[in-house]
Regions:
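Ribokinase/PfkB-type carbohydrate-kinase core domain
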Residues: 1-31, 54, 83, 89-107, ...
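Glycine-rich phosphate/adenosyl-contacting loop at the front of the ribokinase-like
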Residues: 1-77
Length: 221
């Protein structure tokens, strides 16, 4: 079986079943929307929800893909960045227990967390703090980590760091590792279309849904 290594935002998902919309209104959130927040608001959310019951899982696009492949028995690895905090240890332990070979850098910023507030009507409101995940640098990724792998899976959400993606692709090409890119989301593709156009010229396999393909090509299916 071909070996696959993924690189992406290492996140922990925290799901909360809430009885009303108080916290959504308190933080000025759009119900049903996705919101990126900074450390200050993240700390306030954590304090506000400290006593609430939550369901915690690992998250992140590439991370979810790698974990699913591991559960199917594929030999896989994962590159990302976390903090040595409770969420970071939970994240790392979860992947190691699944048999994933991890290359996880550590940062002083808290481990990235995606909080989901689910109201009684089933609507989900997302609040994401990228934290340490967004601080992975090209200089921290050792090219030899790719040795022995046939494919590298790169999530489009890493587009905040062009240098990181370009360095990883260059290292992969030098080692004969095939490059797989997930376009992540149509709005990210639209905002970074020129970069994706350059990236896909060096990509062997592209994962995109209908909306992402439309955003990239400008064409209807």
């Amino acid at each position: 079986m071909k070996e696959i290594i993924g690189i992406g935002n290492a996140l922990v998902d925290a799901l909360y079943l809430i009885e009303n919309e108080d916290i959504i209104k308190e933080f000025g959130l759009e119900k049903g929307g996705m919101h990126l927040i900074g450390e200050n608001i993240f700390e306030q959310v954590c304090e506000r929800m400290r006593a609430a019951k939550r369901e915690r899982t690992t998250g992140g696009s590439a991370c979810n893909t790698v974990l699913a492949l591991a559960q199917l028995g594929a030999p896989v690895g994962l590159i990302g960045k976390i903090n040595d905090d409770e969420n970071g240890r939970f994240f790392e332990d979860s992947f190691r227990q699944a048999g994933v070979r991890t290359f996880l850098m550590k940062d002083a910023q808290p481990t990235g967390t995606a909080s989901t507030f689910i109201t009684p009507d089933g609507q989900r409101t997302f609040v994401t703090y990228l934290g340490a995940a967004a601080l992975l640098q090209a200089s921290e990724v050792a090219s030899q980590w790719l040795d022995g792998y046939s494919y590298i899976y790169i999530e489009g959400y890493l587009v905040q760091s062009h240098d990181l993606i370009e360095a990883v692709v260059e290292a992969a090409k030098a080692r004969g590792v095939k490059v797989c890119v997930d376009l992540a989301s149509y709005n990210i593709v639209a905002a970074e279309r020129d970069f994706f156009a350059r990236l896909l010229r060096k990509t062997d396999i592209v994962f995109a849904n209908e909306e992402e393909a439309r955003a990239f090509t400008g064409l209807e299916p």
